[in-house]
């Protein structure tokens, strides 16, 4: 993930302090119900020891990132991310609910309000805390298959019923070499017996060393007609400091070579033609292309160059922004597959209702989108980065069937 500036870190720490001061004020009211001064003082000390420890840890981590071992760095960032969210969000909700209830209260007397309202607020804080903890320890690896059927007028008849598995955003460094975690995902994928497996980028967080041992795991993925992949923004090493461009390039080459080890064809602004009994479709793949601040390595015209005569095309492009900017109404690409957003790893993801804060940044953030005869599917991703949890946004394996 992209590094935060010291200014943003200081703002975060100030926000934590402000919310904790308000929370502590209302905590004093709740603890009036406790008669033991020892217990009360223990609660107060524990409250501030945690807050001071968290802020100190965040600042120290930021100040030492440049010299820290990369493996340890990634683990510590994720740990502090989880601690910060688990602490800050419930306290913010608690403080907000209690303050609103207290200053708009016309039911309880002032004396009653100082005790009853904070208790109500306490329950309002416990709920998000439970959701966050559940998202960290239970939802993070609860892989979900989403099955959809898409109809195309231009689909060649010999490709009727084509079975595609679409996965994205593995971020293998976040798994900390716990290879068994992906066993169930691989089993779910292979049970579908797909014709194609498409991976749309962000194999790693930053570094090629994250891939150690994963070739034996990912090589188990099976597809009848082929496995294809493209690169995501994290695969270029752009979010790390390197001793030299040569070292950065070496890291990049190792990441690209990994795809050969797991029998995936990496499409770098290229296309591949698949033929069944004389009928053809084209599978295109571009390097990462995103709106600023993301780089635009992708060259769609280059990938289209040798397949203009193939009427049915599938595009693999990591960032869904690419679809709106360069694909829709500018090409005849029938289906585009993307990832990148993770669904923010948080939101409401029901059958008829989907919402996530990420939708205010990305118009196309999760699920199926259509513009005339062109489709885009954005997966919520299989892995995670930053916050070590998923809140209402389970990791996704997409199973797509193509029909006429």
Could you describe each region identified by the protein language model?
Residues 4-22, 29, 60-73, 119, ...:
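N-terminal active-site segment of His-dependent metallophosphoesterases
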Residues 156-404:
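Soluble catalytic domains of enzymes that build or remodel membrane lipids, polysaccharides, and related
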Residues 1-141:
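Non-catalytic terminal accessory segments
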């Amino acid at each position: 993930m992209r590094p935060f500036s010291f200014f943003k870190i200081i703002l975060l720490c100030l926000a934590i302090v402000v919310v904790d001061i308000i929370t502590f004020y209302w905590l004093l009211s709740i603890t009036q119900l406790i008669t033991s001064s020892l217990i009360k003082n223990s609660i107060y000390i524990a409250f501030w020891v945690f807050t001071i420890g968290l802020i100190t840890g965040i600042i120290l981590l930021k100040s030492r990132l440049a010299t820290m071992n990369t493996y340890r760095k990634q683990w510590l960032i994720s740990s502090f991310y989880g601690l910060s969210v688990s602490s800050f969000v419930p306290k913010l909700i608690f403080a907000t609910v209690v303050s609103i209830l207290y200053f708009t209260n016309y039911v309880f007397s002032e004396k009653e309000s100082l005790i009853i309202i904070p208790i109500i607020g306490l329950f309002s804080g416990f709920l998000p805390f439970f959701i966050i903890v559940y998202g960290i320890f239970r939802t993070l690896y609860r892989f979900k298959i989403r099955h959809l059927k898409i109809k195309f007028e231009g689909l060649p008849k010999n490709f009727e019923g084509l079975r595609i598995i679409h996965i994205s955003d593995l971020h293998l460094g976040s798994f900390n070499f716990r290879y068994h975690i992906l066993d169930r995902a691989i089993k779910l994928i292979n049970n579908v017996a797909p014709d194609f497996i498409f991976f749309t980028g962000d194999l790693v967080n930053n570094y090629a060393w994250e891939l150690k041992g994963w070739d034996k795991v990912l090589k188990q993925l099976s597809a009848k007609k082929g496995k294809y992949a493209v690169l995501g923004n994290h695969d270029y090493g752009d979010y790390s400091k390197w001793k030299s461009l040569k070292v950065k390039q070496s890291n990049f080459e190792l990441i690209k070579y990994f795809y050969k080890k797991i029998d995936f064809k990496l499409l770098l602004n290229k296309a591949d033609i698949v033929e069944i009994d004389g009928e053809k479709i084209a599978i295109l793949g571009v390097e990462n292309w995103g709106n600023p601040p993301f780089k635009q390595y992708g060259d769609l015209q280059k990938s289209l160059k040798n397949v203009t005569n193939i009427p049915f095309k599938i595009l693999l492009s990591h960032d869904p922004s690419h679809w709106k900017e360069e694909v829709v109404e500018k090409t005849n690409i029938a289906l585009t597959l993307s990832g990148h957003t993770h669904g923010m790893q948080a939101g409401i993801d029901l059958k008829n209702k989907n919402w996530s804060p990420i939708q205010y940044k990305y118009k196309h953030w999760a699920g199926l989108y259509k513009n005339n005869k062109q489709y885009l599917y954005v997966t919520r991703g299989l892995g995670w980065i930053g916050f070590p949890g998923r809140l209402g946004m389970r990791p996704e394996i997409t199973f797509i069937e193509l029909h006429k």
